[in-house]
Regions:
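Hydrophobic alpha-helical segments and their helix-loop junctions in multi-pass secondary transporters
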Residues: 139-165, 174-175, 194-221, 406-414, ...
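Extracellular/periplasmic helix-exit of transmembrane alpha-helices
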Residues: 205-215, 261, 268-305, 375-379
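Hydrophobic, membrane-embedded alpha-helices of multi-pass small-molecule transporters
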Residues: 48-65, 204-210, 218-279, 321-330
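Extracellular loop-to-transmembrane helix junctions
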Residues: 1-19, 73-103, 112, 446-455
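Membrane-interface loop-to-helix entry segments
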Residues: 5, 9-29, 130, 146-150, ...
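Flexible loop linkers connecting adjacent transmembrane helices
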Residues: 20-46, 69-72, 86, 94-123, ...
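Helix-loop-helix module between adjacent transmembrane segments
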Residues: 10-11, 15, 91-107, 111-176, ...
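Membrane-interface "cap" regions at the ends of multi-pass membrane proteins
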Residues: 10-67, 232, 259-262
Length: 471
C-alpha cells in the first residue's frame, strides 16, 4: 500500500507544483477575452460555469480509459502504477493543458488547425483526415460495448441492434443540439457518478488494505505470456496516462471557458483527476488478479466483480452506470469534435441545423458501416479497438511535437514537451512493428527500429531548431 499511497500523493502534488510551473511557461492573461464571449453563437461557443466545464471535460476525456485501460495495464505489475503517475503528470497533463490553452488563444480552433499552425499545411491536411477517422472510430467503438451490456440487462426482444439504434439516436441529438442543452445538463451527473465510484473503491482499498505490490519488490513483468512492457503497456493504459483523443476534446471546452485562469483546473486538473481514477482502478485490479489469477480478460467483468464485492448492490448499479454512460458520452463528443473539425475545414457556420446535418449524416453512415462489420466478424470489434488504441497514441505524438514547436518559436522551455514527444514517438513506432495488428515482428528488432525512427525524428527537429535560432 505504501507505493500506492505515494503515487496518489505524487499526482496531487503534481497538479499544484508542476501544473503551476507549466501555467507560468504558457503565460496566462486573465484580462484577455475568451472565445466563449468573442465568438458566442449559442451552439458551440457558450460561456459556462467553471465547475460544469471541468466535469464535462473530465467525462469527455475519461470514457472507459482510466478504468478499462488501467485494469488491462495492471497485469504488467507495479510498472503500471509508475507509468500512470509519471505519464499523467509529465506527459498527459502537459499535453492536455497546452493543447487546450492554444485552442483557447486561437478562437477555439480544432486540433488539426492548431497542429497546422506549427507543423505546416501538409500536416494540417493529414491531421484533418486522421483525426476525423479517429473520432469516427471512437464513436463506433463506444457504441457496441454499452449496447451489448444494455441488451443483457433488458428483456430479450430488446437486443443489441435495438440498443445500437437507441444510442445512435442519442448521438444525433447530442451532436446537433447546442452544447448546453444535453451535454451541459447530464454530463456533470455522469461525471459525478464516475468519481463517486472511484472514491468508493479508494475508501475500500484503505478499509480492506489488500496486499499490493511495492516498488521495493522490484518490477517484474507479471503479464501472462510476458508481453513486453515496452511498448504494449504504454499503449494499453492509454487515457490513464496520455491520450491524443484528449486534445480533440479540449477545443470543445475551450469554447466555453470564461477566463484563461481556469485553464489549469480544467485541462491540467481533469487529466490529473483521470490519473487518480486510473491509479485507483489499477490497484483494485491488482488485488482482483492476486485473488482470481490473470485469466480474466474482460475488464467489464473485473469492474462488476470489484464493485459488487466492495460496494454492494448500490456499487453494482454505479458500475453499470459508469460502464454504460462513460463510453456513450465519449462517443457523442467524438462525433461533435468530428463535426467541428469538418466545419472548420469547410468554413461552414454551425448556427443552422441544416449545416450541421450536412456534416453529421456522412459521419454517422461511416460509423454504422464499421459497426456492422464489428458485429458480423467475430474479431471485428477487437481489430477496430486495437487500431483505435494505436491511432489515439499516435495523435498524442503529433500534438506533442506541435506543442514543442510552439514553445521553441515562443522562446519558452521546450524540454517539457520534447521529452514526452520523444518517448511517445518511440512507443508508437515500436508498437506498430511488434503488434499483431501491425507487422508482428520480434520485439527486440521492433525496439531497435522504433528507437532508430525516434533518433531520426530528433535529428530533423534539431536541424529545424538550429535554422530557427539563426533567423
Amino acid at each position: 500500500m505504501i507505493t500506492f499511497v505515494c503515487c496518489l500523493i505524487a499526482l496531487i502534488v503534481g497538479y499544484f507544483v508542476y501544473g503551476k510551473f507549466i501555467e507560468r511557461i504558457f503565460g496566462i492573461d486573465a484580462k484577455r477575452q475568451t472565445p466563449a464571449y468573442t465568438h458566442q453563437d449559442g451552439v458551440d461557443y457558450i460561456p459556462m460555469p467553471t465547475w460544469k466545464v471541468f466535469m464535462i471535460q473530465f467525462l469527455n476525456i475519461a470514457g472507459l480509459g482510466p478504468i478499462f485501460g488501467a485494469i488491462m495495464g495492471a497485469k504488467f505489475g507495479t510498472a503500471s502504477f509508475l507509468w500512470i503517475v509519471l505519464g499523467s503528470i509529465f506527459a498527459g497533463s502537459v499535453h492536455d493543458y497546452l493543447s487546450g490553452m492554444l485552442s483557447l488563444r486561437h478562437n477555439g480552433e480544432s486540433l488539426p488547425e492548431i497542429i497546422g499552425r506549427y507543423l505546416g499545411v501538409n500536416f494540417k491536411q493529414f491531421m484533418r483526415g486522421f483525426t476525423v477517422i479517429l473520432m469516427v472510430l471512437v464513436g463506433s467503438v463506444f457504441v457496441a460495448g454499452p449496447a451489448g451490456l444494455l441488451a443483457k440487462l433488458t428483456p430479450e426482444h430488446l437486443d443489441t441492434t435495438f440498443w445500437i439504434i437507441v444510442v445512435f439516436l442519442y448521438y444525433i441529438l447530442a451532436t446537433l443540439l447546442p452544447v448546453d442543452k444535453i451535454i451541459g445538463k447530464i454530463y456533470p451527473l455522469f461525471a459525478a457518478a464516475l468519481l463517486f465510484m472511484a472514491i468508493g473503491i479508494l475508501v475500500m482499498l484503505f478499509v480492506n488494505h489488500p496486499p499490493l505490490p511495492e516498488i521495493t519488490d522490484g518490477m517484474p513483468n507479471t503479464y501472462p505470456g510476458h508481453l513486453p512492457i515496452f511498448p504494449i503497456m504504454f499503449v494499453s493504459i492509454a487515457c490513464g496516462a496520455i491520450s491524443g483523443f484528449h486534445a480533440t476534446q479540449s477545443p470543445l471546452m475551450a469554447r466555453c471557458i470564461k477566463n484563461e485562469k481556469y485553464g489549469r483546473p480544467i485541462f491540467f486538473g481533469s487529466m490529473i483527476t483521470e490519473g487518480i481514477v486510473a491509479l485507483i482502478w489499477a490497484a483494485a485490479a491488482t488485488y482482483f488478479y492476486h485473488n482470481n489469477g490473470m485469466g480474466e480478460n474482460n475488464a467489464a467483468v473485473v469492474v462488476d466483480s470489484i464493485t459488487k464485492e466492495w460496494l454492494g448492490k448500490g456499487g453494482g448499479i454505479l458500475a453499470v452506470l459508469g460502464v454504460i454512460a462513460a463510453p456513450i458520452t465519449s462517443g457523442d463528443t467524438a462525433f461533435r469534435s468530428a463535426r467541428l473539425i469538418v466545419a472548420d475545414f469547410l468554413h461552414l457556420e454551425q448556427r443552422s441545423v441544416s449545416k450541421r446535418l450536412m456534416i453529421c449524416i456522412p459521419l454517422f453512415l461511416v460509423a454504422i458501416a464499421l459497426l456492422l462489420y464489428s458485429q458480423k466478424d467475430k474479431d471485428g470489434f477487437d481489430m477496430i479497438w486495437r487500431y483505435f488504441a494505436w491511432s489515439n497514441q499516435t495523435l498524442a505524438v503529433f500534438t506533442l511535437w506541435a506543442l514543442t514547436v510552439y514553445l521553441v518559436i515562443s522562446k519558452k522551455p521546450y524540454i517539457v514537451t520534447l521529452i514526452p514527444a520523444l518517448f511517445m514517438t518511440a512507443v508508437c513506432s515500436t508498437y506498430i512493428f511488434v503488434a499483431p495488428e501491425g507487422l508482428g515482428m520480434e520485439n527486440g528488432i521492433s525496439q531497435i527500429i522504433g528507437f532508430a525512427i525516434t533518433i531520426v525524428v530528433l535529428a530533423f527537429f534539431l536541424v529545424w531548431k538550429k535554422k530557427t535560432d539563426n533567423i
